[in-house]
C-alpha cells in the first residue's frame, strides 16, 4: 500500500469516526473554523455578510469600531486608555487596537471557533502587527476577502442604508428593506440611519478608503490569502461567492 493510499484510508476512518460520534451525541457538529479579514468600502455589504459568516461558522464578528466603543463603555483598562487619547483628539494606537483584538480572542467565548475581522487592519503596519500577534497565538489569518464595488453604485446604496446598532445588521430602503418599516427583522428594535451616510461624507470616506486599502490588498495578495468578490451582485450571490473563497462550495 502506498503512502497516498494510507492517507486516504486514514481520512475515511476519521470521517467515519466523526460521523459515528455525532450520531451518538458524543460531540457537537461544530463547523469548520474560520480566521478571516473582511475588506470593503462603506456600503459594500460587510454589515450584511458578516452576521451570516458569524452564524455559519459559530465565530465572533469583530467590528473594530463597535469593539472600541464597547471597551470604552465597559471602562476596561484598554478602553480607559483609548478614551483618554480620543478625548485629546488623538488616534487610538495600533498597539491598543491589536491588544483589544487579542483580548477578545482570549476572553470572548464566541471566538473559540474563529473570527471575522471587519474594519481592521487599514494600514500595512496594522496588518503586520496583527499578523505578529496572531502568529504568536498560533491562529494565523487564513483568508482576506475583499468586497469589490464601483464608487458610483456605493453612493446609491449607502444613502438609503439602515442599521441595527446592537448587532451591526444592515438593510436598505430600496434594495434590501426590513419586513416592517424601520424595524430590525430579528430583534424588533428600531433601525437608524447613520449621520455620515450621505453623499458628501461618503465620497470623503471613499477617498480615504482607497488610499489606505489598496496597499492592504497588495499585502494580502503577496501572502496568498486574498480573494475578491463582486459585491455589486445580489446579497445571496455575494454570499455564495464568499463561501467559494472559503472553500465551502
UniProtKB/Swiss-Prot annotation:
Keywords annotated in UniProt: ATP-binding, Cytoplasm, Kinase, Mitochondrion, Nucleotide-binding, Transferase
Record carries keyword Signal: no
CDD domains assigned: ADK
Classification via Pfam families: ADK, ADK_lid
Region (LID): 160-197
Binding site for ATP: 43-48, 161, 170-171, 233
One GO term describing the cellular component: mitochondrial intermembrane space
Swiss-Prot/TrEMBL GO biological process terms: ADP biosynthetic process; AMP metabolic process; ATP metabolic process; DNA replication initiation; pre-replicative complex assembly
Region (NMP): 63-92
Main EC class the enzyme belongs to: transferase
InterPro entries: Adenyl_kin_sub, Adenylat/UMP-CMP_kin, Adenylat_kinase_CS, Adenylate_kinase_lid-dom, AK2, P-loop_NTPase
Top-level taxon: Eukaryota
List of residues binding AMP: 64, 69, 90-92, 119-122, 126, 194, 205
GO MF entries: adenylate kinase activity; AMP binding; ATP binding; DNA replication origin binding
Listed EC numbers: 2.7.4.3
UniProt catalytic activity: AMP + ATP = 2 ADP
Protein's cellular compartments: Cytoplasm, Cytosol; Mitochondrion intermembrane space
Signal peptide: none
HAMAP family: Adenylate_kinase_Adk, Adenylate_kinase_AK2
Record family assignment: Belongs to the adenylate kinase family. AK2 subfamily.
Self-association and partners: Monomer.
Annotated function: Catalyzes the reversible transfer of the terminal phosphate group between ATP and AMP. Plays an important role in cellular energy homeostasis and in adenine nucleotide metabolism. Adenylate kinase activity is critical for regulation of the phosphate utilization and the AMP de novo biosynthesis pathways.
Domain comment (free text): Consists of three domains, a large central CORE domain and two small peripheral domains, NMPbind and LID, which undergo movements during catalysis. The LID domain closes over the site of phosphoryl transfer upon ATP binding. Assembling and dissambling the active center during each catalytic cycle provides an effective means to prevent ATP hydrolysis.
Name under which the protein is recorded: Adenylate kinase
Amino acid at each position: 500500500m502506498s503512502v497516498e493510499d494510507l492517507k486516504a484510508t486514514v481520512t475515511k476512518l476519521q470521517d467515519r469516526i466523526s460521523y459515528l460520534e455525532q450520531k451518538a451525541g458524543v460531540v457537537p457538529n461544530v463547523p469548520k473554523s474560520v480566521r478571516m479579514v473582511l475588506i470593503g468600502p462603506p456600503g459594500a455589504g460587510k454589515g450584511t455578510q458578516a452576521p451570516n459568516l458569524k452564524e455559519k461558522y459559530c465565530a465572533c464578528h469583530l467590528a473594530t469600531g463597535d469593539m472600541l466603543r464597547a471597551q470604552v463603555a465597559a471602562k476596561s483598562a484598554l478602553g480607559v486608555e483609548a478614551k483618554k487619547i480620543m478625548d485629546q483628539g488623538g488616534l487610538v494606537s495600533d498597539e491598543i487596537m491589536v491588544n483589544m483584538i487579542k483580548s477578545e480572542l482570549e476572553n470572548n467565548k464566541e471566538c473559540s471557533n474563529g473570527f471575522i475581522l471587519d474594519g481592521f487592519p487599514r494600514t500595512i503596519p496594522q496588518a503586520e502587527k496583527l499578523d505578529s500577534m496572531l502568529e504568536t497565538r498560533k491562529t494565523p489569518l487564513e483568508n482576506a476577502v475583499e468586497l469589490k464595488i464601483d464608487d458610483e453604485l456605493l453612493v446609491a446604496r449607502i444613502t438609503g442604508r439602515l442599521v441595527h446598532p446592537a448587532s451591526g445588521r444592515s438593510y436598505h430602503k430600496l434594495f434590501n428593506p426590513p419586513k416592517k418599516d424601520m424595524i430590525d427583522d430579528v430583534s424588533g428594535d428600531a433601525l437608524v440611519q447613520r449621520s455620515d451616510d450621505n453623499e458628501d461624507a461618503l465620497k470623503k470616506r471613499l477617498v480615504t478608503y482607497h488610499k489606505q486599502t489598496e496597499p492592504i490588498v497588495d499585502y494580502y495578495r503577496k501572502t496568498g490569502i486574498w480573494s475578491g468578490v463582486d459585491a455589486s451582485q445580489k446579497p445571496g450571490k455575494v454570499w455564495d461567492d464568499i463561501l467559494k473563497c472559503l472553500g465551502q462550495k
